[in-house]
Amino acid sequence: MIVKVRVIPNAPENEVVSRIGSVLRVKVTAGEVNEEANNALRGYLAEFFEVAPRAVNIIRGAKGREKTVEITGQPEESLRRVMESIP
């Protein structure tokens, strides 16, 4: 499943803030230095969607806050249900 993500770094905790259509707004505790935010995002999304960290790949936007992320490791239907549960 392909997901658009807007990352908010330096947050007090990792959390999915909201979903607007297929775009997730995600806060991560890591800063923007040396891939820290990308690694934190991968780890958090893996936990959130219940997949292995290697199943979360940033395919576009690795150096910006707007990212396109591919999530594999679960059936598309299961991942879509998780997405739809986000307010």
Protein language model regions, located:
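C-terminal structural segments of small proteins and small subunits
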Residues: 53-87
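Residue-level signal for inorganic ion chemistry
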Residues: 5, 45, 56
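Compact, glycine-rich, soluble single-domain proteins
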Residues: 15, 19-49
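A generic structural signal for short, solvent-exposed coil/turn residues
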Residues: 8, 18, 50, 61-63
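Solvent-exposed beta-strand sheet faces enriched in polar/charged residues
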Residues: 6-8, 27, 59, 72
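Short amphipathic alpha-helical surface micro-motifs
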Residues: 6-9, 40, 50-54, 82
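A generic structural signal for short beta-strands and their flanking turns/coil linkers
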Residues: 1-3, 20-24, 52-54, 65-67
